[in-house]
């Protein structure tokens, strides 16, 4: 009779131990996923900042060009930032965001930047009155806005994924604590 009572108790202990092992394994997987997401998130704030810098600096450049003040250094600066945003090169420590929407917007913006530079050359040679520089500058500003918003959306998506993993990890740990309490209470009987 005693052996039969011990067996179900031992069986319950084994089941609880197996469940605990699974929960610990799941927790390890959650931590790995969270570390991956945090790595993806690192550097996005800098990308958002520099994407915004491109927007503002381009407007400044156009204003300077319209008033007859050439600024080839600013053009080079903008070229370098756009290259860093697209290819993760240069000396601004920019990361490449692996997000299709952002990359598509950045590609369109970069292509339009090349057209805008051609228009700047036209301003330099014939004055801004004979060009479409103001309208092109406005179009470029909106493109840059869309690129910044896409980078912000990417960052927000990752933050939501990290928050979800955090909540699932907390739930996993709560289950582990409950099982430990059950084991402790069972051992005290």
Pin down the residues of each PLM region.
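Selective recognition of signaling/oligomerization transmembrane alpha-helices
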Residues: 153-189
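Extreme N-terminal signal-anchor transmembrane helix of membrane signaling/transducer proteins, especially
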Residues: 10-38, 171-180
